[in-house]
Amino acid sequence: MLPALKYLGKTVSVTMDRPLGSRHPKYGFVYKANYGFLPGTVSGDGEEIDAYVLNIDRPLQNYTGKCTAVIHRTDDNDDKLIIIPQEDEISDLEIETQTAFQEKWFKHIIIRKIPAIHLICGFIGFGKTTYAKRLEQELPAVRFTHDEIMCARYGRSPEDFPEKYKLIDKEIRRDAAAEISRGHNVILDYGFWSKKKRQAYYRWARQLTPEVCFHVLRCDLNTAKERVLKRNADNLNELFIDENAFNILLQQYEPLSEEENYPAVFISSPPLSD
């Protein structure tokens, strides 16, 4: 996660090295807002985290206020906190307007919330991808579905399945980390059948963001099997799993229980006719 994001919503103290009305030492433009840094912090560029103090119309030396947003420069790995008075609110448009004197030269995005990773958990046929697609629109988020990518790249019944799956998983982890760094929510529609896999993924996800949650799909196994056999015939864009494979894979499935003590929501999958 971007170092600056941990300050979102918190009260911070800023030391101004370029107060309102001062000029940039190299380029000469006038600072139309107070601009400073958080002492003792480290940003993505190795220097102290910078901050704009907005909605204040006088030069400042020091200021304590709330961090309401982060400007993330996508082309130079630099971030700027947006600090305003505790009682104030500010829109993205107002942030853009008040910081344009400097930020107009950089590609950037405004981040308001710490991005989250949502881990979709459940066995084959439990409705994980249907649920993940809905969540993708609601949040919004960037969704990664392992089986979808596998099928598109290698077909419905790929040879050397475990090795290819590991390659896909490595790519997804890389791309998911990049999306989190851009402030985007991420959905991993993977299944997470075993306790060991859940532990490993949870540790990895927590290294990227403190906001990690399992979404646990529950479903009657007969309904799940019926769904899988039906989509084998109806959907050529799904991995092919016959009844024998379903039964064998079921032996590997360890349902997530509340005793595992992960942040989780539990969802009952609707019947097949829904």
PLM ranges: what are they?
Residues 1-113:
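Hydrophobic N-terminal alpha-helices or hydrophobic patches in metabolic proteins across all domains
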Residues 114-118, 182-184:
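Pre-Walker A (Motif I) flank of P-loop NTPase domains
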Residues 117, 121, 126, 133-134, ...:
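Conserved GTP-binding G-domain of TRAFAC-class P-loop NTPases and closely related GTPase folds
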Residues 120-126, 134-135, 160, 195-199, ...:
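A structural preference for long, well-packed, hydrophobic secondary-structure segments
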Residues 126, 130-184:
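Conserved substrate/cofactor phosphate-moiety recognition/catalytic segment
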Residues 163-212:
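Glycine-rich phosphate-binding loop used to anchor ATP phosphates in small-molecule kinases
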Residues 166-169, 173, 218, 243-250:
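Amphipathic alpha-helical transducer elements in NTP-driven molecular machines
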Residues 208-228:
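Conserved phosphate-donor/acceptor-positioning beta-strand/loop module used by diverse small-molecule
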